[in-house]
Regions:
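Flexible, charged surface loops at secondary-structure boundaries
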Residues: 13-22, 58-61, 231-233
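A structural signal for leucine-rich repeat
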Residues: 81-82, 199-200, 221-231, 252-255
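Consensus positions within tandem repeat domains that build extended binding/scaffold surfaces
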Residues: 108-111, 130-132, 151-154, 173-176, ...
Length: 286
């Protein structure tokens, strides 16, 4: 891991960028703090056209930097947030084309909010806090084989994302995929606790794989505030659930769907291709 000071780290990254390098690899200490990440983002921000405003960067700018960070266990909140009122080095997020976090286990809230990257890989991340990748409108490739917990709206407004695999994910906050209008397939075979408006405005969905669902937040009693919302035609969606799935019932006092003791397999809901108030193209148990 680097023994550099923040100034030395900033200078090293700046030199690499000035030499025309676009593949930037940095090895940080496990406990690297926000000041070390700021040294990196301050250098990256200088590669972005200063005449472009925030709107132009978010909507139209294509990043050119492939960034790999190893060693560090946590990416601090708002590190690459593209917002001039939140992040001093806000242009750095627009510089990114791809991000690889080889050793990180936690990604802080809004860490990559509205960044320009198309590819994101974090093989050892266990938890991603709320809004961390929200608004990454060019993001198409995501590799998160170990993540177990996703906070609210982690992938909200990732308009280009078509498919995602979350093989170890158990807990999803509210609106994780809200407005992912190109999203076609979601594979989360261990997901048991789901938030409200999880798939709101995911109008391209064709297949969703979940685990043995135990709870689903619906916020209000209206199905409009449920997992899929009425904006989606769930009759075009193939739903896959665990063979251990139980029938769900709605608790109006808590605004949650909760699993009962009754097997879903062979139930009226199953026979009617229904789950938590929605009717699907098919409901398969595996």
């Amino acid at each position: 891991a680097t023994a550099m000071s923040t100034d030395e780290l900033n200078a090293a990254v700046t030199r690499a960028l000035a030499a025309g390098e676009t593949d930037i690899r940095i090895n940080l200490a496990e406990d690297a703090d926000a000041t070390m990440f700021s040294a990196i983002t301050a250098a990256l921000a200088t590669t972005v056209d200063p005449s472009l405003d925030q709107y132009e960067l978010v909507m139209n700018y294509s990043g050119t930097i492939d960034l790999t960070i190893s060693g560090a266990k946590t990416v601090p909140e708002c590190t690459f947030y593209v917002d001039e009122y939140v992040n001093e080095n806000w242009r750095a997020g627009a510089a990114l084309r791809s991000v690889t976090l080889t050793d990180a286990t936690t990604i802080g809230e809004s860490a990559f909010f509205s960044s320009a990257m198309t590819s994101f890989s974090a093989p050892n991340v266990i938890e991603i806090e709320g809004f961390a990748l929200e608004g990454c409108m060019k993001l198409t490739d995501v590799y998160l084989p170990s993540v177990q917990t996703l906070g609210d709206a982690v992938f909200s407004d990732c308009y280009a994302l078509k498919t995602i695999s979350l093989p170890e994910c158990i807990d999803l906050g509210n609106g994780v995929f809200n407005s992912c209008e190109a999203l076609e397939t979601v594979y989360a075979p261990k997901a048991t606790n789901l938030g409200a408006i999880e798939f709101m405005l995911c109008t391209s969905l064709t297949k969703v794989t979940l685990g043995s669902v135990q709870s689903v937040n619906q916020i209000y009693e209206s199905i409009d505030d449920g997992l899929f919302c009425l904006a989606n035609d769930t009759k075009n969606i193939e739903l896959v659930l665990s063979s251990e799935q139980k029938v769900m019932t709605f608790d109006s006092s808590t605004k949650y769907w909760k699993a009962t003791d009754t097997d879903y397999n062979g139930s009226d809901d199953h026979n009617n291709k229904s789950f938590i108030g929605y009717t699907f193209k098919s409901v398969t148990l595996q």
